[in-house]
């Protein structure tokens, strides 16, 4: 009984609660960073230095009345935000921080599978809202997500060939002597840009283009369900950056200080998340055709070429005599 309680309730909660707390303070950090970059102060009224602002926002959203459009599809309308958050939380289970909750042999395949399932929550919410703006936003988001998943998958394939394993622990071991960002820097650059597009962040925030689509696929959502979408989006941003740190920035390995493993990984993920915010403050939104041109005409041929290159490398060097 106790073991069941620990494995099925306490273990998941042990990573879900910190992730949700991190998401809350990431929203505050984003508002502060954008504020200072636009030469103004961010939130600074609620609590010391505005530290209680995200908690106030969360409470406000969840005590609002959940308004539902009369013409919407009732069950799907409520189910999709729940699906979005569930998927965003499940993604964290196989991440070694330093030990995964789910120790899988094919962890990277699970990431790809679960991140492509997120498409259904977006499409479902756009369709269930029964609003043309929500549907246009959802279709854009789905096209963008599916397109950039192609390059993410191919980059992951190259890295798997490079390191020789599907688990992030293998990546950890492979990067003990050199971080993968150095030999595979073109992959790292394309991966980072693709994660920006995959998480619908500026300059790829076409789905919530305020100028033409009000707020994108979640335009009809208010209160609690909207907060669930919001939490899912920011949890995905944090997850993608933690994954990027694991794949390219030597994961969490310091041979001299194994105690600092988790702090090390979190610091790298936080720095990458700050760059996400910096990009948002600096760049204007892409046009839709430029967004699609970038992936299909630029990234796809390049990633395919690099997959072939990484396939050829081990075969080429296999014939060399061992170095004494």
Curated annotation (Swiss-Prot):
Belongs to the complex I subunit 1 family. It is a multi-pass membrane protein. The keyword Membrane applies. The keyword Amino-acid biosynthesis does not apply. Keywords: Electron transport, Membrane, Mitochondrion, Mitochondrion inner membrane, NAD, Respiratory chain, Translocase, Transmembrane, Transmembrane helix, Transport, Ubiquinone. It is found in: Mitochondrion inner membrane. Core subunit of the mitochondrial membrane respiratory chain NADH dehydrogenase (Complex I) that is believed to belong to the minimal assembly required for catalysis. Complex I functions in the transfer of electrons from NADH to the respiratory chain. The immediate electron acceptor for the enzyme is believed to be ubiquinone. The lineage of its organism: Eukaryota, Metazoa, Chordata, Craniata, Vertebrata. One of its GO terms (biological process) is aerobic respiration. One of its GO terms (molecular function) is NADH dehydrogenase (ubiquinone) activity. One of its GO terms (cellular component) is mitochondrial inner membrane. PANTHER family: NADH DEHYDROGENASE SUBUNIT 1, NADH-UBIQUINONE OXIDOREDUCTASE CHAIN 1. The chain crosses the membrane at residues 9-29, 43-63, 75-95, 106-126, 146-166, 177-197, 228-250, 259-279, 299-319. PROSITE patterns: COMPLEX1_ND1_1, COMPLEX1_ND1_2. Its EC number is 7.1.1.2. It catalyses: a ubiquinone + NADH + 5 H(+)(in) = a ubiquinol + NAD(+) + 4 H(+)(out). This is NADH-ubiquinone oxidoreductase chain 1.
């Amino acid at each position: 009984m106790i073991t069941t309680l620990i494995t099925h309730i306490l273990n998941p909660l042990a990573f879900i609660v910190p992730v949700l707390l991190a998401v809350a303070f990431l929203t505050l950090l984003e508002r502060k960073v954008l504020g200072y970059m636009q030469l103004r102060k961010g939130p600074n009224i609620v609590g010391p230095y505005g530290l209680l602002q995200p908690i106030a926002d969360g409470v406000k959203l969840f005590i609002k009345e959940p308004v539902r459009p009369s013409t919407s599809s009732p069950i799907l309308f409520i189910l999709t935000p729940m699906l979005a958050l569930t998927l965003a939380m499940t993604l964290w289970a196989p991440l070694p921080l330093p030990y995964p909750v789910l120790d899988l042999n094919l962890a990277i395949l699970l990431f790809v599978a679960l991140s492509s399932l997120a498409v259904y929550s977006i499409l479902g919410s756009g369709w269930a809202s029964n609003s043309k703006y929500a549907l246009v936003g959802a279709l854009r988001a789905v096209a963008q997500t599916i397109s950039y998943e192609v390059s993410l998958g191919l980059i992951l394939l190259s890295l798997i060939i490079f390191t020789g394993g599907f688990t992030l622990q293998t990546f950890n071991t492979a990067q003990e002597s050199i971080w993968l960002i150095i030999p595979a820097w073109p992959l790292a650059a394309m991966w980072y840009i693709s994660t920006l597009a995959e998480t619908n962040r500026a300059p790829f925030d076409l789905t919530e283009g305020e100028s033409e689509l009000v707020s994108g696929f979640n335009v009809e959502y208010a209160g609690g369900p909207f907060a669930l979408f919001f939490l899912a989006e920011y949890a995905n941003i944090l997850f993608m950056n933690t994954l990027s740190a694991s794949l390219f920035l030597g994961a969490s390995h310091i041979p001299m200080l194994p105690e600092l493993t988790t702090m090390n990984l979190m610091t790298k993920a936080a720095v990458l998340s700050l760059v996400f915010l910096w990009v948002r403050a600096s760049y204007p939104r892409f046009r839709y055709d430029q967004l699609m041109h970038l992936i299909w005409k630029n990234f796809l041929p390049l990633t395919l070429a690099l997959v072939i290159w990484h396939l050829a490398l081990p075969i080429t060097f296999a014939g060399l005599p061992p170095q004494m």
